[in-house]
Regions:
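Nucleotide/phosphate-binding sheet-loop regions of phosphoryl- and nucleotidyl-transfer enzymes
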Residues: 1-289
């Protein structure tokens, strides 16, 4: 019997932390409790270990199981990755069995390309949102998956904002963001000598491998050593339907804690940003930041 590397959220539970990582196990548990969790699947920590010890390659068996899980996710969502009319977009996140906040990598809005971005714009009636998501994806993918410095994109974005008199990202119009997207694609082309990848399944596999590699990045290495986390544990990869915080002023993103991190007081504490995505909170963007 072939080894199982990929688990739909409905196939796991909280007791499978070693295999699915903390995030994957808890997402599975919440799914099985009937909570409204955006659906997805988890690629196991065992796949990570075999990837890193086997020449940094996904086996054919792993790829086959990822494709089967993706097909199930598409069926549940009623959308397809890369579809020109109703595209499915996913996030790709790490999830080790021990909490390692900020140590490993995340890719959001995966599945966008030059065709599906137009489908997203038409489906949502929000062209600005579609191109905001695409330019974010290009920068994240280039940085996390390929290793193109994020600062190259941030510098060009700042230059563009200055040229049009925009103080904040949220001041940019749909047409502005189309131009920023083209600028970002050119940065990728200049750096890599090839166009930004347009095949969504290729994007997904590359992002999953990048998360596996991030288990061994310098930040994660130091954190593991400081916290006695064995290398052999590996990290899982969680692929989940996107929920968007950047669709306008009625959406947002945030973090919440059950205790005050500074004092230890048992009280809810958090902060959020309106019309933003999760990485903006982590990156320390201050505009629109509110505390709860």
């Amino acid at each position: 019997m072939s080894k199982k590397y990929v688990y739909m959220f409905s196939e796991g539970n909280a007791g499978m932390r070693n295999l699915l990582g903390g995030k994957g196990a808890n997402l599975a548990e919440m799914t099985n409790l009937g909570l409204p969790v955006p659906y997805g699947f988890t690629i196991s920590t065992e796949a990570c270990t075999e990837y890193n010890e086997g020449g940094k390659k996904l086996t054919d068996e792993m790829i086959d199981q990822i494709e089967v899980a993706l097909a199930k996710l598409e069926e549940i969502a009623g959308k397809k990755l890369g579809d020109p009319e109703n595209p499915l977009l996913v996030s790709v996140r790490s999830g080790a069995r021990a909490s390692m906040p900020g140590m490993m990598d995340t890719v959001l809005n995966l599945g966008l390309n030059d065709i599906s971005v137009e489908g997203l714009a038409k489906k949502t009636g929000n062209t600005r949102f579609a191109y905001d998501s695409y330019r974010r994806f290009i920068m994240m993918f280039a940085d996390v998956v390929i290793g193109v410095s994020k600062s190259k994109f941030e510098r060009k974005l700042d230059e563009y904002k200055e040229s049009v008199g925009a103080k904040y990202d949220t001041d940019l119009t749909a047409e502005d963001l189309k131009k920023v997207t083209a600028i970002f694609k050119q940065i990728y082309l200049d750096d890599q000598g090839k166009e930004f990848p347009q095949n969504p399944k290729e994007q997904l596999l590359e992002a999953a491998m990048a998360v596996f590699r991030s288990w061994d990045n310098p930040r994660a290495f130091v954190y593991r050593r400081m916290n006695d986390i064995p290398y052999s544990w590996g990290t899982a990869v969680n692929v989940q339907m996107m929920v968007f915080g950047n669709m306008g002023n009625t959406s947002g993103t945030g973090v919440a804690f059950t205790r005050n991190a500074a004092t230890g007081e048992k009280a809810m504490l958090g902060e959020y940003l309106v019309n933003a995505q999760g990485e903006d909170v982590v990156a320390g963007v201050q505009i629109g930041r509110a505390h709860v």
